[in-house]
Amino acid sequence: MALDKLLEQEAQSEIERIRAEARDRSQMIVAQAQERAQALIESRQRALETQRQAGIVRARSAADLDLNAARLTASESGMSQVYELVNQQITEITRVPEYRDILGRLIYQAREVITDAEAVEVNPAEAALARELVHDIAVRENPAIQGGVRVVARGGKSGITNTLAGRLERVRGELAPQVSRLLAE
């Protein structure tokens, strides 16, 4: 019986050793699997965080673009309103007594450029005033001229238009930043 017991003990020891080895190996496999799982989780978290940050950047960029577009639209609308108001003021200026001096200067400046002038063209509403100011050449009515004068030479083949609206249009680009700044305040 002692041999049976001895064999049984050896078998039991071998079983315990194999179980211990299997336990160690399974613990090692589980630990490695947990490490891989943790690494995968961390990798996914980093990827998600990167995507989240990229999404935030895109959202901010889109919001900035929308804001700038809204500002630009508001600025353009404001600029249009300002120039519309200025054009209305120019139309009203032609009705004030001081317009005589303004029209006189516009005629003088245009005639300095066109030295061989044959005629001065003005709006029909300003023709009487222009005739008071110009005595040496013809004054013709031209409904297309508003708030200023057109001086013509060589049978109308050359000429220059000098109007308040034309002057405003020439400096509009230079005034735009200043007007925008004032509208933003």
UniProtKB/Swiss-Prot annotation:
GO molecular function: ATP binding; proton-transporting ATP synthase activity, rotational mechanism; proton-transporting ATPase activity, rotational mechanism
GO terms for biological process, alphabetical: proton motive force-driven plasma membrane ATP synthesis
Gene label: atpE
Protein known as: V-type proton ATPase subunit E
Pfam families in the cross-refs: vATP-synt_E
Stated role: Produces ATP from ADP in the presence of a proton gradient across the membrane.
Keywords, alphabetical: ATP synthesis, Hydrogen ion transport, Ion transport, Transport
Residues that span the membrane, as ranges: none
